[in-house]
Amino acid sequence: NCIKEVLAEYRVPKIGGIPPLTGGFVGYFGYDFVQYCEPSLQFDPTKATDFPDFDLMLFDKIVAFDHLKQKLFIIVNVRTDNLEVNYAKAEREITAVEALLSSSVAQRPFIAAKLGEVKSNQSKDLYAANVQKCKKYIKNGDVFQIVYSQKFTADYDQDLFNAYRILRTTNPSQYMVLMKNDDVEIA
């Protein structure tokens, strides 16, 4: 409900010709967050991840790039409570973003990274056995969907921006994201 209350103050009209995301919350809900939505599920705190259960950031400014059309959008939302003042402020913010984007930035080279030993939280045999259990639960009608995963970890000696750039080049996806804040970095 808290998220809905905040978003109620940020309603924007649909405007043709611009990306559908013009602001709002960006972030993630971790797998362990399900314990708050489905109290009937038993949660084992000893198996919790090191990630926060969720991390949301509220944006009222967006720089979006349409890779298909090779077009950049600078979107600044304007609050309507003091329209003239807020509109002028938004124009200044757009000008500042344009200046920042137009400035010369040194291209960071791809850096050969060293990946440490890849470790899993379970053996291949255990994973396969658990997938079979999941299929049985679905077939029996106990559940209709299971998002079962296997956690892999490895030490990585570069920042994740480098990994993100490599992934974006070798295996692009419309859902790719690089998120970095004080607590966590995800690519």
Where are these regions (language model features)?
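Extended alpha-helical targeting/anchoring segments
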Residues: 1-187
